[in-house]
A protein has these predicted regions:
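Structural motif at the C-terminus of the N-lobe alphaC helix and the adjacent alphaC-beta4 loop
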Residues: 40-50, 103
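Conserved short submotifs of the Hanks-type protein kinase catalytic core
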Residues: 63-77
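Conserved kinase catalytic-core helix
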Residues: 79-115
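ATP-binding glycine-rich loop module of kinase domains
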Residues: 7-35
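Short beta-strand micro-motifs within the conserved protein kinase catalytic domain, predominantly
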Residues: 54-66
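An alpha-helical support segment within catalytic cores of ATP-dependent transferases
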Residues: 105-135
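Short, flexible helix/strand-to-coil boundary loops that buttress conserved ligand/catalytic motifs
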Residues: 26, 45, 82
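Conserved N-terminal boundary motif of the eukaryotic protein kinase catalytic domain
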Residues: 1-5
């Protein structure tokens, strides 16, 4: 079965390949970021209770681009559902809120804290002087 393009942006393309989804990163995409994404997914998988596609492989494609292969989960996006059933918009939004609440109720001690990540990224910004970085 040939890969079917599902989604594409400036840094990656996602393909369906049978019962797998393959995210292929563009040439030059940092290896550390690819491996970190896979590690975060594996850690979230390990806590259980959140239906995320399992990581099956992290590899280098024939063209030298990194890829992450996951199980493909059949279904429609929230946008597709809302377009097909506009009368159920509130119901879908409530389901999304419940999902977010459930996700945030989980503890995954091995994940980096978002606050720390944001502080690090802000401190690395040369465009901001130290006074604005502090604010």
């Amino acid at each position: 079965m040939a890969r079917e393009l599902i989604s594409k942006n400036a840094t990656k393309s996602v393909y369906r390949d049978g019962d797998k989804a393959v995210k292929v990163f563009c040439k030059g995409f940092p290896k550390a970021e690819v491996l970190n994404e896979a590690l975060i997914s594996a850690r979230v998988e390990a806590i259980g209770g959140i239906n995320i596609p399992s990581i099956q492989a992290v590899s280098v494609e024939e063209d030298g681009c990194w890829s992450i292969t996951r199980d493909y989960i059949e279904g429609k996006t929230l946008t597709e559902l809302m377009k097909e059933n506009p009368d159920k918009r509130d119901e879908y939004l409530n389901q999304m809120v419940e999902l977010q609440l459930m996700i945030h109720s989980k503890t995954c001690p091995l994940l980096n804290k978002l606050k720390d990540k944001m502080a690090r990224q802000i401190s690395e910004m040369e465009e901001l002087d130290s006074v604005n970085r502090y604010d």
